[in-house]
From Swiss-Prot:
One of its GO terms (molecular function) is metal ion binding. InterPro entries: COD_ChbG_bac, Glyco_hydro/deAcase_b/a-brl, YdjC-like. Pathway: Glycan degradation; chitin degradation. Belongs to the YdjC deacetylase family. ChbG subfamily. The lineage of its organism: Bacteria, Pseudomonadati, Pseudomonadota, Gammaproteobacteria, Enterobacterales. This is Chitooligosaccharide deacetylase. Keywords: Carbohydrate metabolism, Chitin degradation, Cytoplasm, Hydrolase, Magnesium, Metal-binding, Polysaccharide degradation. The keyword Phosphoprotein does not apply. Homodimer. It comes from Salmonella paratyphi B (strain ATCC BAA-1250 / SPB7). Mg(2+) binds at residues 61, 125. The gene is chbG. One of its GO terms (biological process) is diacetylchitobiose catabolic process. It comes from the Bacteria.
Amino acid sequence: MERVLIVNADDFGLSKGQNYGIVEAYRNGVVTSTTALVNGEAIDHAAQLSRELPALGVGIHFVLTLGKPVSEMPGLTRDGLLGKWIWQMAEEDTLPLDEIAHELACQYQRFIDVFGREPTHLDSHHHVHMFPQIFPIVARFAAQRGIALRIDRQTVLNADDLPSDLRSTQGFSSEFYGEEITEACFLRILDASAHRGEASLEVMCHPAFVDNIIRQSAYCYPRLTELEVLTSASLKAAIAERGYRPGSFLDI
């Protein structure tokens, strides 16, 4: 059985070093897709690079935890900025869901304005779209616009409640991260997906060159390790040997 493999690099637009790392992993490695932070400091640079790579699938990386929102969000921001206090608000069930829905629509339009096209798919920074309160908003939005959505099925409370016309990969993995950034780890992810009989799989990654913005991230130098592994010739060969076809979210 032919299986589609989407290797999606998150954080396009975060910094020039991030952008260049993603492009390097696409041109000379196994990355096939990326998602962009429309409020990132280097989003215009990302859009410029993407025009040189029309086959690179570019989706939207919905962000509610970093930087300035596109719209006014007095119920979620502090001093005009987004932050990780969203987790506490989710636990307390005090999320401003109307503001979040409006911000999603605004970020989507911002993506179209910057990139000049619709995004191929939708996911989010720090996976906030998988919060139980936020997921229905994002799932409806993606289904209405006919774009695919990253779904971590281990965290969806009831998969039967998903919109029938919502597209996603059958499998998703965030395991290629942190201490487990090795070719062996990547291949274990593929083998586990194949064992489950999944016809499509998304593997999340964050390849980057380190610059001043990336140095401020808690997840800094591992991004360089990711880039090294993802551009390995042996990894590309091993993926092909397992019968996976590289693709984007337009292929599912």
